[in-house]
């Protein structure tokens, strides 16, 4: 019987069934219905429903007993919501047919996601009786009065004292709600998590209303030491745009700090007063000093991208870090890398003073990123010892990376080479001596030709994009590949019969070649063939021939 299959497999099967057939399945018998609804309650994020072609009454009645329900991007309307009055957690994000009237039926909901709905106004938030968590992201009509309705069940007069709280809001997302002001914080005193990113500027004095906040995402603050003193329980702070001026102390419980692109006053932060900090994003903080990194000695994940004043001395304090990004820290040299030998991930893109010798210190780092930039900068050399699981190389404009470098990557499993026009066919021969290499990605490497691909014949996963020299003949060399991905290679107009191939992904910038599709029809042994095409391609082209079930056409704007 179907229900005797492993739970994980059943979850995948049921989550892939289209909504109309899913509801028919619920009507088979009580045993099947109870099993599926239990699974639905336990894994609400695995299921989403589109009610467009379903009988509204029949479909919703089966969902009445479900406590956690995901109906995001569906066609559910106000009349259907009245059948879900007892739901505990409901996701109706991006449901354009929902209005204030529909929300009036959800009096008992505890967790609600109604984001991306321009129909919801302040009046729609006054009927909740138990709500604790709500997502109002991109609900552009919500104002401070709506927050009053949410918390007290009514709007307040200017001289009216704050009444008894009806709903104790613990978590609220007001991102991109441009009519909300920081004055609404006085109604969210018991909140533990507030997101007000990309809204109007927040004023310092309003922080006094949220002393119990643990997660705060907020924009445009000019935060002083006095204002932050009240936030003694905060664990995670994300300051958005408008370059906050920060003098942080008293944040001894803070575990995550995201503070990117602060050009001024960053040098005044004393990280020693944040002993519990484990994650910090300080990218673009150009005035960050070496001495400040002493306070980050216990941080496990650290982003110092484009912190131009950081030197090897600063890295000497970071011997315990596990994941670090020091890309475009131009003062870092080979000597500094010896302090990162215990890391699991190191990004050294654009570190122009790092040479071959520096890679000796990184030989035990599982994941190493060298390059991966769209700027016309050249990256560091990689000659030397290397035990890299993942390597990215890009913009090799000064011939710093040649085939010789690849000989040292004996334990590399994935290599990505981007926009390196100095990499030629002969360089790829180095890959034949890398037994652990399982994936290679060649992007914008226009000096690689068909002959170069012959060196990749034993690599399981091969991706080739934006190459104007490789043709169908080159693909024929990939005899042992399990997955091949082709994007924007105009000379590839047919595929050879590669018997070991299990998945093929093909992206075209122009019209779909019918000869190519007929060619693919012959390959039943390939489990999945994805053909991505531009929206402007006439779909009538696809109806002129019979298409095998293993071929899937996907409209893609790329």
From Swiss-Prot:
GO cellular component, one term: SCF ubiquitin ligase complex
InterPro entries cross-referenced by the UniProt entry: F-box_dom (IPR001810), Leu-rich_rpt (IPR001611), Leu-rich_rpt_Cys-con_subtyp (IPR006553), LRR_dom_sf (IPR032675)
Domain F-box: 1-47
Any Pfam family the entry gives: LRR_6
LRR repeats: 73-105, 139-176, 177-220, 251-284, 285-317, 329-361, 369-395, 420-444, 445-477, 481-508
Any one Gene Ontology BP term: SCF-dependent proteasomal ubiquitin-dependent protein catabolic process
Keyword line: Leucine-rich repeat, Repeat
Top-level taxon: Viruses
Name of the protein in question: Putative F-box/LRR-repeat protein R542
Native species: Acanthamoeba polyphaga mimivirus (APMV)
Lineage, broadest ranks: Viruses, Varidnaviria, Bamfordvirae, Nucleocytoviricota, Megaviricetes
